[in-house]
Amino acid sequence: RVESQKKRLVAEDSRMLSNLIIGFLHKSGYKNTVKFNNGKEAWNYLTEAKESGLPISNYASCIVSDVEMPLMDGHRLTKLIKTDDELKHIPVILFSSLISDELRIKGQEVGADEQITKPEIVELVNIIDRLIK
């Protein structure tokens, strides 16, 4: 795999899991990753990116988000992104241990491009490969 400079955002409140995800992404050639502790931090970053006047692709090519986080959860973050004309093209992957049938339906309703359970980190990289090509 060729190293990609496209920027990936990871919103995850667990330090251990975010380090695991980012470490695995780095090993897979995705070195340009920005980490947020919750959906609110990620949303603030995206809002500032829009205000910069530069292409959004300079700031985010893909977003990986946990579902349950403080301040703003992954479903709310996804809905905000997918209802924003400047951001809706960015793929959002919900990556959580909480993907029940009910939560999968909610993820689809808010516009998540993919939903995957946390133990499937190899599958996460395969999904990112597919969504950003």
Predicted regions and their residues:
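Two-component/phosphorelay signaling modules centered on CheY-like receiver
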Residues: R15-E41
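Receiver (REC) domain active-site loop signature in two-component systems and cognate sites
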Residues: M69
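Active-site T/S-Asp motif of two-component receiver
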Residues: V64-D66
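Conserved acidic carboxylate
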Residues: E12
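Acidic, metal-coordinating helix/loop segments flanking the phosphotransfer/catalytic sites
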Residues: K35-C62
